[in-house]
Amino acid sequence: MATQHIPVDCITFAGNGEPTLHPDLEELVHEVKRLRHQYFPTADVGMLSDATQAHRPGVARALRALEVRYMKCDGGDEAMWRAVTQPLGSVAWNTMIAALKNLPDIILQSMFIQGQVDNTQPGHIETWIRLVGEIRPLSVQVYTIDRAPADSRAHEVPLARLQEIAARLSQRTGIPAEVYD
């Protein structure tokens, strides 16, 4: 890409699995940044993360070393977050939220679904808005599922409802929010 002069905006850690689970994450971030400086000096280095490991010191250092941090939080309280996310293992909600509050300049991503689990109900949206206001991200990306999930009881949220959620968040908190569909 560098030899072909293809512009690169951001080199992003993401994929099938959670990148913060890698045992050598901190070293990988520093090596990718070194290579970025050499080949794509104007590109950012970022990560998409479910935030469950952000409390670990090495992970927190790696995340702070990045220019862009996309961190997920799909619920305004622990019960809804667990219902939507279905995390593996024992993830401590309060620890995860504290870590999100301590990370600088994050972009929060929140997925909304309807069906047996529905995090678009007015009461839950108010809880979520309060939480996002406490976390104080740079911005929020609101989205829904884009293909049929393994659990057929989850359904996508209409675009108009996502736009209402994003607008309400911005109006109440002043935090920019945009809908990805």
Please place each PLM-identified region on the residue numbering.
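Residue-level signal for beta-strand positions within conserved beta-sheet cores that form or flank
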Residues: 7, 41-43, 175
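Conserved hydrophobic residues forming the short capping helix/wall of the S-adenosyl-L-methionine
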Residues: 1, 36, 166-169
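Binuclear metal-ion centers of metallo-dependent hydrolases, dominated by the metallo-beta-lactamase
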Residues: 158-181
